[in-house]
Amino acid sequence: MDGIDFATTRINRDLALLLKSRVALYEGTFLKYFKGTAFVPNGEGWPGKSKEYNANYEYPSGNIDNEINFFLDEAMAASKEVAEKYKGQLTANTGMLQQAADDPENPYYNMFCDEDLSSYPEVLLWRQYTMNKGNDIALAANMGNWGVGITRSFVQNFLMADGTPVYTHGTYADGDGYYMGDQTIADVRTNRDSRLSLFLKEPGQTNIVWDDQPGQSLNLIEPVPNIIVGDMQRAYTTGYALRKGGALNSKYCIQLKGYVALVCYRAVEALLNYME
């Protein structure tokens, strides 16, 4: 079946290999880091030893070290096959949020709010929607994530653009001039990992570039986070909100009728699994 192009809304070989690498990596590293403890068979205090059906348990490969090597080898082989195929086809992130119709598009941003993901090679599986069977992905991103805010500690976990952690740059509140502190959202986004600076919403940003479905009660321009409103659809519970999935066209923001696609699995995970 090699050479046949399958719709990536269905299970395919590359997806199966990715899942194989994920499971094998988990199993191998779990055995490796919990070796000798009660969390793995035959470890100190392992409760399975007291069960008649497990009293003489032996690993299929002979011992735990062989088992670890088996799973890690399988993870490496499966992830390498996918990684080699897609390493030159990952979606580019310009780091910029499109703010006007004549601004350059950011393919990475669009990958999470497009209606058809078949043009993104790294997306190995995605879910398609229609207006009759829709979602509220784009609408939630346009609002305050419907009362599910991210925490300050979550934001602080993102590295700086140069790969250094935030805590090496002065205080969390004030920074050192490279890390700008967190007095404002604009400061938080400055010189950060491009995924944070792209997806963390900032007051004053344009949320809707094309208003093809006017008359909706949308945030065309991102407001100051409203943390006291009682309407959970518009509530910003922490002051930090994400725009991932936030389509720039209002036609995708009709309640219960949005049809931006949902990314399920991406080939980039295979590269990460292989490196690990």
Predicted regions and their residues:
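Active-site beta-strand/loop architecture of penicillin-binding DD-peptidases
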Residues: 217, 222-266
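Glycine- and aromatic-rich loop/turn segments at beta-sheet edges
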Residues: 1-5, 89-94, 252
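An aromatic- and glycine-enriched ligand-binding surface/loop that stacks and positions planar moieties
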Residues: 10-14, 24-226
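Second-shell loop/turn segments in exported
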Residues: 4-7, 60-68, 257-261, 274-276
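Short, hydrophobic/aromatic alpha-helical segments in well-folded domains
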Residues: 19, 78, 195, 273-274
